[in-house]
């Protein structure tokens, strides 16, 4: 018996296996299938599975096997045939299920049959794809469809889901083959919640699908939604409350969640309320509803300009903040009666730039033909400048800078207010009231004269040192200066530099003794071209740093630039340059001075007749009396018709308004022109020094040599030297600022005539000696004595240098003209 059963067992085992893809002679082991079509020989099974996709072949323990199990559950749901697999059916529904399942099996269920097409079937066509099938090919036949209908193995799929019919089980309905699931749905609706066939009389239909009445509820809170509002999420219904709490999107603009009742705009995973306020440009807030927009970095913009962060209504310049601040202060200064300073700033910027290149940023030109290089070559040895003129103008700068007791309150900068209000160690004191100053001008008190012993070791003023101008420039660039960008009109930066000079004891008693000689007007023609106006250039740099002159009054100031080519340079759009390289916010004020000054030079006027000064002792004016020059240099002074000095006359349109000073009315209005010149005197000086050299050497006075000077110093009294040193420390730091004005103001001669002698006192030689004024007192105080310098000329009494006052140079305009005609001072010795 076992021997008879052995062939049958081997045949059964062979039916459960398939041959390998290789030849049987290769010796490879046969692979098992999880399922094989019934009634086929091994070679026929191999041909059938060869027609299927590899991933769908049901090898044992293969993805194809898992796919087969999944398709069995999906295509043939057990709850469609068996009551035990249903969750909640009434007794009536259970009966209906049984009837329904039996009817389907009876009327539609079938299994496909695998056959090889015979050679006689020459015109067989696949029912699914419509392509012709040849004899000898494997084909699937469905008995319910008819004997002549066949399909390719890969085309035997459900008509609804287009999936291969698992295990060749099909349901035939209306000429189409279906899987068990979709065939049942053709007859009865299926609940989307429980996946069961709905046998009840009522159901809920939504979104093209059906639910049991009790199954159509919120997935979160299980609230029945029949007849209510709901929201579908991934095929599941939610009530509005649960959906907002779980899945509501938040607006990118306002941050609030977008409710179910609100329309929303969505782009690239971002959401906005569909309102003009929320769905708008991130930069200009323009509504983008119905408009194209530009997304960038999570934001939406209306244009490329807005996406770059630019304001189309504002300036795109990087210095617009500085420019707007300067414009505001310029407008405020005009309302307050203060000058906009645009013309001075343009000229000073031109001085610091090459003559033909306005964009050069340096303080001195690198080319030999630049204007700053030429100015540097004027006086290289004039590092410490004319003491007499400097002390006169600088004392007036300090006086006028602190004139208004409440001027500090007009400035917005806190540091400027402190400097204006308190000064540095009471150096700048509040001046007396306007009434007192009209009555009399006080002499400088002794306590204002600070004699610092360390001043003897300083041979230059602080601002005159080579590195100082660069240091203060960098300081202002860093925002450390009081008026670094010209944001407010005020003298704080200039005054602070003067205070620093005093603190460092600049230009002490032992100053370079050649400066007196080199700074005097008579010696200007001896200056070598290699020399530079160091202090004038420093003052220009400092003026550019602060962006505001010390005076800042709205009265037009004279423009005393006498270089031949400078006015041509000045005419070329000087408003394009400002202190810091930005557009000058005060461009409208550029023509007030340049046009008037040129006008005054084109139209020469009558020369003011000279007046001989009153015979009074030579006295040095104190800080309170020495305000900056208040005189407009009109054409009667600048005109050189009678002096043979080549000074170009400006056109009529650029002439400054001439101001005539009536010194006999000084008692009634002594302070109407107080804030006229301050730092401008420093910058103007650099230009006029060039024309001063045209005086020949024969017009100079006899001067002391260094050896004679040492002997002269030893002969001076100790008390006189002490008084001199005090004044030298106070006024010595102001260097080289006013030597150019001496030639051009005979009106100032009248102004200072009360304090000087006639021409003899200004131009007296050192051959005679007198002790009458060696120790003079005035108003109970010793007369301040200027510092002695080498190569310095003195008056007959040897009490003080004649150039200690600017007055001699104001009078030398007339004396030099006399000398040209053969008239000399009675005590003058021409060297």
Swiss-Prot record:
Gene3D superfamilies: Cysteine Rich Protein
Disulfide-linked positions: none
Function: Involved in the planar cell polarity pathway that controls convergent extension during gastrulation and neural tube closure. Convergent extension is a complex morphogenetic process during which cells elongate, move mediolaterally, and intercalate between neighboring cells, leading to convergence toward the mediolateral axis and extension along the anteroposterior axis. Necessary for nuclear localization of REST. May serve as nuclear receptor.
Residues covered by the PET domain: 14-122
Subcellular location field: Nucleus membrane; Cytoplasm, Cytosol
GO molecular function, one term: protein-containing complex binding
Keywords: Cytoplasm, LIM domain, Lipoprotein, Membrane, Metal-binding, Methylation, Nucleus, Phosphoprotein, Prenylation, Repeat, Zinc
Positions of the UniProt region annotated as Disordered: 314-346, 664-688, 763-831
Propeptide residue interval(s): 829-831
An annotated GO cellular component: nucleus
Comp. bias (Basic residues): 669-680, 815-831
Residues modified as Cysteine methyl ester: 828
Annotated lipid attachment (S-farnesyl cysteine): 828
Gene name of this polypeptide: Prickle1
Protein name: Prickle-like protein 1
Organism phylogeny: Eukaryota, Metazoa, Chordata, Craniata, Vertebrata
Domain LIM zinc-binding span(s) in chain numbering: 124-189, 189-249, 249-313
Assembly and interaction partners: Interacts with REST.
GO terms, biological process: animal organ morphogenesis; anterior visceral endoderm cell migration; aorta development; apoptotic process; axonogenesis; basement membrane organization; bone mineralization; cardiac muscle cell development
Phosphoserine PTM positions: 315, 591, 594, 683
Family: Belongs to the prickle / espinas / testin family.
Principal location listed in the UniProt entry: nucleus
Biased composition range(s): Polar residues: 797-812
């Amino acid at each position: 018996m076992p021997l008879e059963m052995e062939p049958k067992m081997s045949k059964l085992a062979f039916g459960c296996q398939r041959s390998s893809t290789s030849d049987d002679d290769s010796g490879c082991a046969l692979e098992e299938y999880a399922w094989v079509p019934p009634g086929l020989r091994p070679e026929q099974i191999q041909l059938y599975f060869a027609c299927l996709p590899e991933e769908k072949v049901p090898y044992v323990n293969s993805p194809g096997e898992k796919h087969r199990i999944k398709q069995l559950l999906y295509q043939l749901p057990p709850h469609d045939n068996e009551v035990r697999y249903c969750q909640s059916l009434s007794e009536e529904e259970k009966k209906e299920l049984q009837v329904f399942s039996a009817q389907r099996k009876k009327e539609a269920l079938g299994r496909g049959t695998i056959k090889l097409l015979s050679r006689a079937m020459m015109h067989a066509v696949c029912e699914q794809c419509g392509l012709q099938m040849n004899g000898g090919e494997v084909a699937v036949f469905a008995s319910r469809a008819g004997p002549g209908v066949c399909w390719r193995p890969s085309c035997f799929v459900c008509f609804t889901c287009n999936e291969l019919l698992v295990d060749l089980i099909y349901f035939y309905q209306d000429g189409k083959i279906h899987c068990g699931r979709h065939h049942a749905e053709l007859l009865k609706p299926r609940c989307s919640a429980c996946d069961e066939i709905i046998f009840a009389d009522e159901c809920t239909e939504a979104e093209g699908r059906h639910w049991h009445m009790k199954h159509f509820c919120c997935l979160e809170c299980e609230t029945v939604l029949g007849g209510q509002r709901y929201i579908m999420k991934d095929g599941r219904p939610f009530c509005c409350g649960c959906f907002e709490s779980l899945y509501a999107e938040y607006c990118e603009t306002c941050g609030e969640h977008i409710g179910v009742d609100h329309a929303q705009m969505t782009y690239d995973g971002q959401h906005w309320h569909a309102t003009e306020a929320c769905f708008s440009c991130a930069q200009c807030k323009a509504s983008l509803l119905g408009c194209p927009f530009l997304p960038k970095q999570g934001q939406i913009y209306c244009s490329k300009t807005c996406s770059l962060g630019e304001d189309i209504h504002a300036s795109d310049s990087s210095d617009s903040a500085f420019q707007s601040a300067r414009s505001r202060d310029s407008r405020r200064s005009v309302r307050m009666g203060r000058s906009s300073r645009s013309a001075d700033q343009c000229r000073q910027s031109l001085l610091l730039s090459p003559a033909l290149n306005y964009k050069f940023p340096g303080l001195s030109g690198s080319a030999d033909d630049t204007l700053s290089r030429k100015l540097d070559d004027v006086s290289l040895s004039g590092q410490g400048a004319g003491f007499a003129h400097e002390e006169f103008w600088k004392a007036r700068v300090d006086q006028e800078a602190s004139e208004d007791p409440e001027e500090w309150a007009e400035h917005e900068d806190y540091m400027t207010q402190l400097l204006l209000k308190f000064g540095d160690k009471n150096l700048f004191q509040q001046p007396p009231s306007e009434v007192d100053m009209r009555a009399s001008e006080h002499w400088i008190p002794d306590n204002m004269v600070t004699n610092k012993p360390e001043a003897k070791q300083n041979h230059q003023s602080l601002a005159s040192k080579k590195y100082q101008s660069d240091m203060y420039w960098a300081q202002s660039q860093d925002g450390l200066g009081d008026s670094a960008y010209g944001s407010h009109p005020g003298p704080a930066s200039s005054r602070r530099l003067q205070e620093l000079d005093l603190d460092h004891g600049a230009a002490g008693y032992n100053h370079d003794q050649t400066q007196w000689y080199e700074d005097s007007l008579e010696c200007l023609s001896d200056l070598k071209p290699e020399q530079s106006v160091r202090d004038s250039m420093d003052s220009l740099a400092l003026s550019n740093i602060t962006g505001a002159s010390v005076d800042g009054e709205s009265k037009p100031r004279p423009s005393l630039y006498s270089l031949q080519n400078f006015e041509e340079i000045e005419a070329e759009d000087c408003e394009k340059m400002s202190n810091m390289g930005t557009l000058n916010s005060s461009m409208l004020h550029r023509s007030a001075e340049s046009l008037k000054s040129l006008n005054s030079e084109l139209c020469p006027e009558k020369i003011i007749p000279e007046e001989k000064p009153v015979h009074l002792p030579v006295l040095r004016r104190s800080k309170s009396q020495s305000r900056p020059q208040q005189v407009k240099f009109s054409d009667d002074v600048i005109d050189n018709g009678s002096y043979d000095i080549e000074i170009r006359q400006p056109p009529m349109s650029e002439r400054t308004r001439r101001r005539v000073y009536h010194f006999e009315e000084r008692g009634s209005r002594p302070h109407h022109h107080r804030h006229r010149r301050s730092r401008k005197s420093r910058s103007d000086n650099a230009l006029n020094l060039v024309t001063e050299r045209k005086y020949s050497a024969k017009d100079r006075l006899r001067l002391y040599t260094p050896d004679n000077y040492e002997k002269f110093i030893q002969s001076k009294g100790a008390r006189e030297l002490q008084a001199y040193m005090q004044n030298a420390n106070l006024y010595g730091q102001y260097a080289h600022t006013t030597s150019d004005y001496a030639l051009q103001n005979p009106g100032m001669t009248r102004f200072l005539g009360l304090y000087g002698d006639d021409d003899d006192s200004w131009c007296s030689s050192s051959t005679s000696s007198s002790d009458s004024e060696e120790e003079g007192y005035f108003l109970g105080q010793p007369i301040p004595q200027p510092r002695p310098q080498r190569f310095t000329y003195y008056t007959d009494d040897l009490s003080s240098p004649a150039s200690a006052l600017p007055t001699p140079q104001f009078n030398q305009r007339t004396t030099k003209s006399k000398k040209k005609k053969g008239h000399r001072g009675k005590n003058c010795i021409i060297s």
